[in-house]
């Protein structure tokens, strides 16, 4: 198998939980060597976060795929110096702590850049550098609230709604990943130096829902919660079927709306400008929704989907986890793969998302035990002797 496009890039990941580690995951899937640095003893809280089996966090296993795991106490001077030795032979540093913590550990950007000018440093934090909140602790939940996401999600008469998964962290990790690749391109292709990448958890998610701030800036309007509707598409909703399943429809273009009308046995609406024109159709969104729901409610999911697929309507079933894993299209694409893990045995995890024809991503292994690669990284890579490593262990440095 061909090497990944990031082969030869070494990443030191000294971040915990979600955003930073997810960026490290993406880089590691496509060939980068990722060395995850954790505190001795407890390690990354992600190891026991969320659902567990035999005490092992399931999310940890997937998020920490392909990573070499080492332990290092960055509060101790010897740990800090060993960390800098690791940075000397690396290309990227991913951190996720507050600026004050990085400064205490001598891994703030000013110190890192002075000692390792070649290094790309990606700092993902709750609020980002600069501003009065820069040194406050922050999790994705706070970003989902501050970004405006929670304000626009939910039913009109209901409370702001937070997602039951790591949305802000995930979006921030994507922004961080492509920023790292751009910074490496600048360094290696244009002959530049390393640089700081400053990503917070609020701004990437706010960018996704920028239509809200645009509406306020230009129209003086503050969009609120509208349930499953979208002000640029009708019909657009989730509809319950006769067998108590659900399907979703999006009709962003007039052509799709016409297909929906014909599929639900209302072909006359496909010729009526009031139901085809995007603006006038949106004004009748509730009426159109009711027509679609009435038709869907009289049919099973299979029958409704068959009719919509025959009419080339953009519709899809609402899946739970089991149905997602069983989808024949995703199975044909190899979306999920089974990986043997020494601790938990066979695990089905999602494959790398982007499919590159010449340099595909791959999963070499799932998350390893705490400090599993201490000897290989500190001994073989950095050249520490067995006696030196033993001394560091006794001091609690590694």
Where would I find each of the regions flagged by the language model?
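Beta-strand segments within the central parallel beta-sheet cores of soluble alpha/beta enzyme folds
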Residues: 194-202, 307, 389-393
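Aromatic-enriched alpha-helical interface/lid elements that frame and gate functional surfaces
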Residues: 230, 235-311, 315
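Conserved PLP cofactor-binding pocket of PLP-dependent enzymes
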Residues: 309-330
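Terminal low-complexity tails and localization/encapsulation signals of metabolic enzymes
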Residues: 1-10, 223-224, 240-242, 323-398
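Glycine-rich beta-alpha junction loops
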Residues: 41, 127-128, 201-206, 243, ...
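Oxidoreductase and adenylate-handling cofactor-binding alpha/beta cores
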Residues: 173-194, 207-219, 261-267
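N-terminal helix-loop segment corresponding to the beta1-alpha1 unit
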Residues: 1-192, 225, 369, 373-398
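A short glycine-threonine-serine/GTX helix/turn-capping micro-motif
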Residues: 161-171, 194, 226-230, 234-236, ...
């Amino acid at each position: 198998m061909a090497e990944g496009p990031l082969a030869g890039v070494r990443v030191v990941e000294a971040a915990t939980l979600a955003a930073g580690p997810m960026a490290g995951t993406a880089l590691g899937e496509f060939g980068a060597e990722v060395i995850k640095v954790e505190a001795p003893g407890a390690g990354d809280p992600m190891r026991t976060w969320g659902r567990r089996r035999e005490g092992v966090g399931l999310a940890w296993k997937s998020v920490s795929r392909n990573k070499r795991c080492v332990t290092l106490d960055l509060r101790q001077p010897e740990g800090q110096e060993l960390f800098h030795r690791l940075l000397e032979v690396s290309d990227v540093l991913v951190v996720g702590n507050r600026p004050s913590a990085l400064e205490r550990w001598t891994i703030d950007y000013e110190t890192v850049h002075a000692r390792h000018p070649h290094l790309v440093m990606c700092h993902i934090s709750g609020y980002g550098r600069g501003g009065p909140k820069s040194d406050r602790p922050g999790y994705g939940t706070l970003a989902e609230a501050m970004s405006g996401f929670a304000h626009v999600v939910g039913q009109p008469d209901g409370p702001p709604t937070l997602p039951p998964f790591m949305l802000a962290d995930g979006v921030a990790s994507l922004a961080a990943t492509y920023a790292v690749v751009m910074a490496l391109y600048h360094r290696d292709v244009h002959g530049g130096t390393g640089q700081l990448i400053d990503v917070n958890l609020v701004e990437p998610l706010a960018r996704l829902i920028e239509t809200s701030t645009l509406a306020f800036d230009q129209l003086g309007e503050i969009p609120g919660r509208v349930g499953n509707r979208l002000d640029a598409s009708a019909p657009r909703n989730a509809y319950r079927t006769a067998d108590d399943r659900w399907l979703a429809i999006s009709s962003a273009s007039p052509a799709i709306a016409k297909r929906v009308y014909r599929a639900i046995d209302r072909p006359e609406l496909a010729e009526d400008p009031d139901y085809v024109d995007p603006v006038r159709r949106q004004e009748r969104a509730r009426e159109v929704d009711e027509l679609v729901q009435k038709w869907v409610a009289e049919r099973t999911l299979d029958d409704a989907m068959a009719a919509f697929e025959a009419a080339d309507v953009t519709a899809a079933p609402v899946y739970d986890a089991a149905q997602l894993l069983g989808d024949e299209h995703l199975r044909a694409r190899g979306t999920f793969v089974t990986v043997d893990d020494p601790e938990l045995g066979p695990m089905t995890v999602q494959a790398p998302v982007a499919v590159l024809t010449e340099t595909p991503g791959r999963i070499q292994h799932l998350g390893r035990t705490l400090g599993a690669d201490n000897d290989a990284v500190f001994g073989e890579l950095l050249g520490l002797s067995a006696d030196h490593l033993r001394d560091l262990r006794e001091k609690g440095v590694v």
